[in-house]
Amino acid sequence: MKTKYFIFTALMLTGIGFASCTKSSSNPTIANLTFLATLNGASEVPANSSTATGTATFTYNPNTYILSGTVNFTGIVATMAHIHLGAVGSSGAIVFPLGGASPTSPISFVSTALTTQEQSDLMNGLYYVNVHSAALPAGEIRGQLIQQ
């Protein structure tokens, strides 16, 4: 009788052990990344003496590949604003338009899913925010997006 009880108990405990073991079917969530930029005329290429200033705060979600954020500026009547591709000290092509024609502060932005190349450029510090004006159509204030 003791043998039957022992075998029954062992089988029950084994069954409970297997039942409590579950394989996670979801991938781990990766934390969002924050990118900040300080915009001013001195950061433009070439630099200018504008007294306008601005800030940009962007969040990149590596789980959805979405970049979103806000650009604030003062002392400028903007005609356009963009995120450009380019290292510090160099100019580059527009990657993402921000706020349409004649945007006002603050500008909010949400991307579609970034491509592998766009993700790489963002992570390598190759994106900058540029706010344009009628006086300086190539860009009045600029700031490099830096991961925090």
What would you call each of these model-derived segments?
Residues 2-5, 15-36:
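Bacterial Sec-dependent N-terminal signal peptides
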Residues 6-7, 19, 61, 128:
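Compositionally biased, intrinsically disordered low-complexity regions enriched in proline and serine
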Residues 10-12:
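Hydrophobic helical h-region of N-terminal Sec-dependent signal peptides
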Residues 29-148:
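First exposed extracellular module after export/assembly in secreted or surface-exposed proteins
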